Amino acid sequence: MQQIIDLTVAFVQDRLKFAESGHDWWHIQRVWNNTKLILETEKADQLVCELTALLHDIADSKFHDGDETIGPRVAGEFLASIGVNQKIIEHVQQIILNMSFKASLGEIAFHSKELEIAQDADRLDAIGAIGIARAFNYGGYKNREMYDPNVKPKTNLSKEEYKNTTAPTINHFHEKLLLLKDKMNTPTAKAIAEQRHHYMEGFLQQFYAEWEGKQ
């Protein structure tokens, strides 16, 4: 198992060398660490969970013209090249295809404990202090406004609406980030998410106060 993990780490580090910094190797490492933390109290296939954590953003659809098949395909081709069992490969591919917040807005036919852990590990990195930093980093990357009081957040976005949004970054908090606490699957992730959610609420309160010149 360790050789497979080591080869995968090297592959991902090389592949994401020039990635946008919210979806780079450091994001992968944080999600990997979250995964291992959750696995301390959850029973699941450790190899599947760790490989998913390492490969889940190997070719994110956001940076490949919305193609949601390229990530699972690249991950599968790599894992096959290092001799990973086909059933494990297919499980990892299914998780990558179904683990995102965007995927959860549609119908998901696939389910496994490993998917739950992957979702939690990735979503934890989208909230709290790092989540705030990543949101504004991606907003800057896409040249979006930080905030526009005239553009109200939308609730209950469809999958297509979420994929195509160009709304200011602050809207992303209301349309996704503040919703993640209640979408966690495991007790470990739920406990961590409570604190990170509270931190984001405090940030938004301060942001709005400064925007309006009240503080």
Where are the language model's segments positioned?
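Alpha-helical phosphate/pyrophosphate-handling elements in metalloenzyme active cores
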Residues: 19-49, 61, 70, 74-82
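Generic N-terminal amphipathic, Lys/Arg-enriched alpha-helix
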Residues: 7-18
